[in-house]
Amino acid sequence: MLRSRTVHAGVESPFAWWRLATAVVLGAVGSVGMWSVPVVLPAVQAEFGVARGDASLPFTLAMMGFAFGGVAMGRLSDRLGIVAPVVCGELALSVGYIGAGFAPNLFSFALLHIVIGIGASATFGPLIADTSQWFSRRRGIAVAIVACGNYLGGAIWPPILHHFIAGEGWRATHIGVGVFCGLATLPFLLALRRRAPMHDTESMGAWSAGVQRGLGFSPNALQAVLCLAGLSCCVAMAMPQVHIVAYCGDLGYGVARGAEMLSLMLGFGIVSRIASGFVADRIGGVATLLLSSALQGVALFLYLLFDGLASLYVISALFGLFQGGIVPMYAIIVREYFPPQEAGTRLGLVLMATLFGMALGGWMSGVIFDLTGSYQAAFANGLMWNLVNVLIALWLLMRPGRRVAHA
């Protein structure tokens, strides 16, 4: 009994909430690895004299690094604690960005974004998995809040990067980001030294029984379905997030307006993620996934209908408000339908699929633009991929074995 009380003493304690706040800050800093390419894309394309699809390659490789890095960093966190992957991640960001600032050609610039993606991955999935171990009744909102770190960074980084790229050039900006990432996170590591509370045997047994009942799938089959859903939704999600800056430049509004729309999109994504946590605690992760995915499709359809400056600002805000809760729902579903001793690996695999979707979507949209000379077909392509995710979520929701689990 004494051991049990000691193990669980930190769950939903003030210290747990302090760790949550720390994780949000680290997630915001590390997320620069995801959001810098959309801002720098026009400048890199112009300097290296390449096509739009080729200029999108660094984002694709960054997402691949993020995907594989998330699994590797998650395993490192399981074995050594969360501090080890965070330190490795920030070092990778520093090396990647400083190296990218000196890149002589697009090929080396793109390859260094694999390192950047690996670094950024340490401040997303592993922090979400670690945070979920510190909460029980409020796990939904806790996971949603820590996932906001990524979008908080997405709201902050684009205008900062645009300012320095315009004034100092993209090379000096990348070097500066690398130095900042290496120094800014050091004070926050002390708050993460304590290992997460472990679950007792009785709790693990209850989760294992729940997995056998949940959705009528075997664990591996459910894993595959969730990975397909994650891939599909993020192919659709990547079109506006990766290309909105270039899209505004092509329409004659200027890349600064596009950077503002990206910040607006991701800022409203923060609201969406927090709201989705509250909703998921009431109706479950699967139902919330369906709702968010359907609304994302509505926003993509609106991009097909309107391209005025004011309209794009409004639609970008709606897109952020609608889609921000999608990715955190996969974390909630994993916690609902898989035992805690498997959650880190299962979540890492689903997040890897979502990041493959972002990588594929970013590259595919650039290629479609090169082939058609317009982003209209790229938006339509995203809408079709989004429909796949909606149908999967609807199918899961209608499964006779569906349940809502509360840890």
Label each PLM-derived region with a short phrase.
Residues 18-52, 73, 157-158, 239-245:
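Extracytoplasmic
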Residues 68-106, 280:
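Conserved MFS/SLC helix-loop-helix module at the cytosolic interface between two early adjacent transmembrane helices
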Residues 122-135, 325-338:
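Intracellular juxtamembrane helix-capping segments at the cytosolic ends
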Residues 37-41, 221-278:
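Extracytoplasmic gate region of multi-pass secondary transporters
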Residues 146, 150-196:
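Helix-loop-helix hairpin linking two adjacent transmembrane segments in secondary transporters
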Residues 84-98, 287-302:
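Structural signature of the two symmetry-related core transmembrane helices
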Residues 96, 107-115, 310-318:
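Paired small-residue
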